[in-house]
């Protein structure tokens, strides 16, 4: 067993190797502060046939024992990965995936298991460090060292590993990963920060990343691991030369420049089939399937180089646009009669339908994860059905990609929402991607913002998003605005920026190259800002402010406050009082025991108002001398029990009935209404009444009765 230690950011970072998981090809047990993770890396013996990508899987296992908790619910063990675990797995996957050899076809599985968790040291950040180490000490081909860090921004200072208070009171929460040379991955949210501050944050993060990578280099200097060779199949003799001879570059250009996505795909596929047949004929090959993978690989490379060359040399993109040009945009709101808010945002061949549903406070999402307990009142769900790209696939639950895209759009919008005190509704936004050709997550931000205003949610400002790309050649750096799927696939960087007219609210970046300079990143962010302003103008033209009224189909929520000491009276013995209010007025009621805040939800404003009025009445202090009307609930030989408010029952003793006591007691029955005056409240809160007859002056009652 080997162990290495280094103090970083005022915490001890400890790495152990050879103590646990020794049968794994690579493993690392890493402790940073009180967070401990185990990362393992393994590879299959055989390559997977018929694929053209690295078959990498990253799993992030949350173990509740790491936080000293037992899982909630009926089943007391961890089940399928939670949404937070999936997001953490994606966060680890993104910086390590580009570092595998492009021709690797053996299955690789990286598993990060959280064994102990410190709230101020995110396990996913430690997981990036541990996964990098596990891969580098394994026999798996892996070409680099990466690390990650979480960064906050508060009171003008950047903070590495910020506390929850720093995040809540600060302006930024981003996770950054990279190599010793450059930042390669960013994911996070902000409260309208400037582009300059974002670049400074990445520079600050990279200074910490370099120290983390340096520590890994120190550890890895003690290892001399022989990596598995990546076996590349050799194409048949003469195939590469035949492909070069038969490829017509002008014809390929023409097909790449077909403006419509589906037509372009068909045109390119047809030309690939044509080349395959021509090569087979030239080489006298009868087994087309045998040479097809080699031809496909050569063709893919030719398409990539040609698309990039057209942009660099001629400034023309596949759909005919210039590098800074945005596709045509259209916005519509109020599409459906019964939804609470709706919007259709279309940018070229990417289209998002945003739907807003307003719910009661009790409709919140209950959160019970490794690091979080509580509720979530704003949710954004992103759906990417197969028809949006004209494909046929089985419909199952949300994919990791759908969860990740929805999370990014949610982070872009959430800081523009009104506080719960001003708008007590639970808010759900659903984005249905109806067409997709690049940047559907940023289209989701736009449709979500439009739909929120259409629903009458008092958001502070519109939020728009744009996806940017980069073509990096030895003699050129071309930044692309509003990339399509093809440019995302063949480009060197994909970064998405969302924000208002005043600043950035969400940012995501993935770099396929070794990294980009601060100057280039700043240029790209400013180009993205121009695009964002253009999109925001189109959105404000469609709907410039939240609608003044909510949909008539949205639930009605009204809020009142009672003395916390009176909450028990409102609830009543065994919940009898509150249950009766709920039943009588067809409402839902939520009461905060500590603050006395009462939320009443219903479909009828009249009923909600009546319920609120009754709750206030119940919570109102009953005073000695007060005259009330109540119903007889019980008759005893010594007097009557009268309920003057729900749950508030007192005694009208026979001696307090008045001169016609006997005649009155003979006639009275349960359910009769009687006017009484409170003459005493004892130490236990029990009420004593006297009967008030018609025309009786009761003002004197307050002066010579007292509350004991």
Curated annotation (Swiss-Prot):
The molecule here is called: Polyribonucleotide nucleotidyltransferase
Keywords tagged on the record? Cytoplasm, Magnesium, Metal-binding, Nucleotidyltransferase, RNA-binding, Transferase
Q: What does this protein do?
A: Involved in mRNA degradation. Catalyzes the phosphorolysis of single-stranded polyribonucleotides processively in the 3'- to 5'-direction.
Q: Which reaction does it catalyse?
A: RNA(n+1) + phosphate = RNA(n) + a ribonucleoside 5'-diphosphate
Can you say where in the cell this protein is located?
A: Cytoplasm
> Does the UniProt entry include the keyword Magnesium?
yes
Species of origin reads: Thermotoga maritima (strain ATCC 43589 / DSM 3109 / JCM 10099 / NBRC 100826 / MSB8)
Protease found in the keyword field: no
């Amino acid at each position: 067993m080997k162990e290495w230690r280094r103090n970083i950011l005022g915490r001890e970072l400890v790495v152990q190797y050879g103590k646990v998981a020794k049968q794994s090809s690579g493993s690392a047990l890493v402790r940073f502060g009180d967070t401990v993770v185990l990362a393992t890396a393994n590879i299959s013996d055989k390559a997977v046939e018929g694929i053209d990508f690295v078959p990498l899987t990253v799993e992030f296992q949350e173990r509740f024992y790491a936080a000293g908790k037992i899982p909630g619910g009926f089943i007391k063990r961890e089940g399928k990965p939670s949404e937070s675990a999936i997001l953490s797995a994606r966060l680890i996957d993104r910086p390590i995936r580009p570092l595998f050899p492009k021709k690797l076809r053996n299955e690789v599985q990286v598993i990060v298991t959280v064994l102990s968790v410190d709230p101020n040291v995110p396990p996913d950040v430690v997981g990036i460090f541990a996964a990098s180490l596990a891969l580098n000490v394994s026999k798996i081909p892996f070409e680099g060292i990466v690390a990650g860090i979480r960064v906050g921004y508060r009171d003008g200072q950047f903070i590495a590993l910020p506390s929850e208070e720093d995040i809540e009171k600060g302006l930024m929460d981003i996770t950054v990963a990279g190599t010793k040379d450059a930042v390669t991955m960013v994911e996070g949210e902000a409260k309208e920060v400037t582009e300059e501050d974002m670049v400074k944050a990445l520079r600050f993060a990279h200074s910490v990343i370099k120290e983390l990578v340096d520590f890994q280099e120190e550890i890895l200097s003690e290892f001399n691991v022989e990596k598995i060779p990546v076996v590349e199949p050799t194409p048949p003799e003469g195939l590469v030369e035949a492909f070069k001879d038969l490829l017509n570059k002008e014809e390929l250009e023409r097909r790449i420049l077909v403006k419509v996505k589906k037509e372009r795909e068909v045109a390119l596929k047809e030309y690939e089939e044509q080349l395959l047949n021509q090569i087979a004929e030239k080489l006298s090959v009868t087994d087309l399937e045998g040479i097809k993978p080699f031809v496909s690989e050569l063709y893919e490379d030719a398409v990539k180089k040609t698309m990039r060359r057209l942009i660099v040399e001629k400034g023309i993109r596949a759909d005919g646009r210039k590098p800074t040009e945005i596709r045509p945009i259209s916005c519509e709101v109020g599409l459906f009669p019964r939804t609470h808010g709706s919007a259709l945002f279309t940018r070229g061949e990417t289209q998002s339908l945003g739907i807003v549903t307003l719910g009661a406070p009790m409709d919140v999402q209950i959160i019970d994860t490794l690091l979080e307990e509580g509720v979530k009142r704003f949710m954004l769900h992103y759906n990417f059905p197969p028809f949006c790209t004209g494909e046929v696939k089985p419909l199952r639950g949300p994919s990791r990609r759908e969860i990740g895209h929805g999370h990014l759009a949610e982070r872009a919008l959430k800081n523009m929402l009104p506080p719960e005190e001003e708008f007590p509704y639970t808010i759900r936004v659903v984005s249905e991607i109806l067409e997709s050709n690049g940047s559907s997550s940023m289209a989701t931000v736009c449709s979500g913002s439009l739909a929120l205003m259409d629903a009458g949610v008092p958001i502070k400002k519109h939020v728009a998003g744009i996806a940017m790309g980069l073509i990096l050649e030895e003699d050129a750096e071309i930044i692309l605005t509003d990339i399509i799927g093809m440019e995302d696939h063949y480009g060197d960087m994909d970064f998405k920026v969302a924000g208002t007219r005043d600043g950035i609210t969400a940012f995501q970046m993935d770099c396929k190259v070794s990294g980009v300079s601060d100057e280039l990143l700043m240029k790209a962010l400013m180009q993205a800002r121009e695009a964002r302003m253009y999109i925001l103008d189109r959105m404000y033209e469609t709907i410039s402010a939240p609608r003044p009224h909510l949909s008539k189909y949205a639930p009605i929520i009204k809020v009142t406050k009672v003395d916390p000491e009176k909450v028990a009276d409102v609830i009543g013995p065994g919940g009898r009082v509150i249950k009766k209010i709920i039943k009588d007025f067809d409402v839902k009621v939520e009461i905060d025991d500590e603050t006395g805040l009462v939320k009443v939800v219903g479909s009828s404003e009249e009923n909600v108002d009546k319920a609120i009025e009754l709750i206030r009445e119940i919570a109102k202090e009953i005073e000695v001398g007060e005259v009330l009307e109540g119903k007889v609930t019980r008759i005893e030989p010594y007097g009557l029990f009268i309920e003057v408010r729900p749950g508030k029952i007192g005694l009208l003793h026979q001696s307090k009935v008045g001169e016609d006591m006997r005649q009155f007691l003979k006639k009275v029955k349960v359910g009769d209404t009687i006017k009484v005056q409170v003459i005493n409240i004892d130490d236990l809160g029990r009420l004593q009444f006297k009967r008030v007859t018609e025309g009786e002056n009761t003002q004197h009652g307050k002066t010579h009765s007292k509350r004991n």
